Amino acid sequence: MNILQNLKESDPIISNLINSEKNRQETHLELIASENFASMAVMQAQGSVLTNKYAEGLPQKRYYGGCEFVDEIEELAIERAKQLFDADWANVQPHSGAQANAAVFLSLLKPGDTILGMDLSHGGHLTHGSPVNMSGKWFNAVHYGVDKETNKLNFNEIRDIALATKPKLIICGYSAYPRKIDFESFRRIADEVGAFLMADIAHIAGLVATKLHPNPIPYCDVVTTTTHKTLRGPRGGLILCKDKEFGKKFDKSVFPGTQGGPLEHIIAAKAVAFGEALKPNFVNYSKQVINNAKVLSSTLIKRGIDIVSGGTDNHIVLLDLRSINMTGKVADLLVSEVNITANKNTVPFDPESPFVTSGLRLGTAALTTRGFNDDAFVEVGEIIADRLLNPDDLLTEKKCKERVLTLCNRFPLYEVELEASIK
């Protein structure tokens, strides 16, 4: 076998499927809040010869030889992560956000300990104590939600739950909460009940890095995140701490506690993404992400579609479809038929099951990467509203699909052939 063959020659089936996915991304409006488009540089790092290197352990403390260059790469990723988030300690090895959270649990908790996180149906995450996840099986998980009137965090209610349940760990940071998080108020509650405080900023990491969202580092014992989403890096995880000595306990929980060898090609891609996020133009990008979300939210509200909490402070726009007598499952299908990619999502106090839902979650990070601006997002909002408010109108469906293609052609994704990035 010639290992120098390119993908098209060695496996045309996979090559064709990748090209089909590339075409889908280019010709659809990507509004899934947890997705973004990585740069060519990030993808080049992921597809590099670093894929071949095994490197158990930490830089300068490996169990294998030949790690001198991956040590430099990982050390650079660590330093850039610390600089980006004003942290004194970082571990860049977690394979995902879920793995980062698992490592924190292994360090701070024992089976049966009580953890307090947001209810999944209110915008929490599976790894914050859902009964279908190990976090809900190994620990006594209790939950808080949002206020029924405002759909925002109610710290008096959260405090009452914490005082009643005395959790060992309180988790803040969410997957479908569109408002700013008051980490200082969480810190006061954690101190009052003697709990550790963890922030999972997977969705808002890019906004935190650019100081457009409050930074949890000064208030939380530990912070976890993914490196894609608003940070626009490779799919992976990261753990951060303000206290360097406290942070060291998580090193052993990552390896050998929950993982084996790190993925050095992904760590290199993380380093590239952190470097990109440290540049001034990433601040401008993040500002536009938030502005686009506000424009999208206001456009939909004007068309009579309710938005959870009445708006957004980040990249997430969560539609409450009860306002138009529609389920999330139906809405997801309707927008997908005109080449808009989103996901059905529960809303607070949702009467529907998680398989049906009353909400549709949208995010602006990916399309902002393509260059979508205020005017473009007005059009995105109008297309979505036209489709949802006229579900049985075939002419509207046809016109919406044409308008989507016009936007995609106006804002091309990758203007050069992706194969060029790996030659």
Swiss-Prot record:
One of its GO terms (molecular function) is pyridoxal phosphate binding. Pathway: One-carbon metabolism; tetrahydrofolate interconversion; Amino-acid biosynthesis; glycine biosynthesis; glycine from L-serine: step 1/1. It is found in: Cytoplasm. The keyword rRNA processing does not apply. The keyword Lipid metabolism does not apply. Its EC number is 2.1.2.1. The modification N6-(pyridoxal phosphate)lysine is found at residue 229. One of its GO terms (cellular component) is cytosol. Keywords: Amino-acid biosynthesis, Cytoplasm, One-carbon metabolism, Pyridoxal phosphate, Transferase. Pfam families: SHMT. It is an enzyme of class 2 (transferase). The record marks 228 as: Plays an important role in substrate specificity. Its cofactor is pyridoxal 5'-phosphate. One of its GO terms (biological process) is glycine biosynthetic process from serine. It comes from the Bacteria. Belongs to the SHMT family. Homodimer. HAMAP family: SHMT. Catalyzes the reversible interconversion of serine and glycine with tetrahydrofolate (THF) serving as the one-carbon carrier. This reaction serves as the major source of one-carbon groups required for the biosynthesis of purines, thymidylate, methionine, and other important biomolecules. Also exhibits THF-independent aldolase activity toward beta-hydroxyamino acids, producing glycine and aldehydes, via a retro-aldol mechanism. This is Serine hydroxymethyltransferase.
